[in-house]
Amino acid sequence: MDMKKLIERINFLYKKSKEEGLTEEEKVEQQKLRREYIDIIKGNVKVQLEGVEKIPTANRKN
């Protein structure tokens, strides 16, 4: 599932939970989607951090 659709579905389930409640299946789906979203974000942060290169203090420009 692409990120936009994932977020849309998470938001839909959140709004539905506040307005009328969720079925047990929807609650399970909501938790699964939230976990998938968090895992994607963690992966993106990890990739970004792995690409960071430390510059020695002597080579920095102020």
From Swiss-Prot:
UniProt key word Cytoplasm: yes
UniProt keyword list: Cytoplasm
Statement: the UniProt record of this protein carries the keyword Cytoplasm: yes
GO cellular component: cytoplasm
Taxonomy, superkingdom: Bacteria
Cited Pfam families: DUF896
Compartments where found: Cytoplasm
Family per record: Belongs to the UPF0291 family.
This protein's name: UPF0291 protein CLI_2672
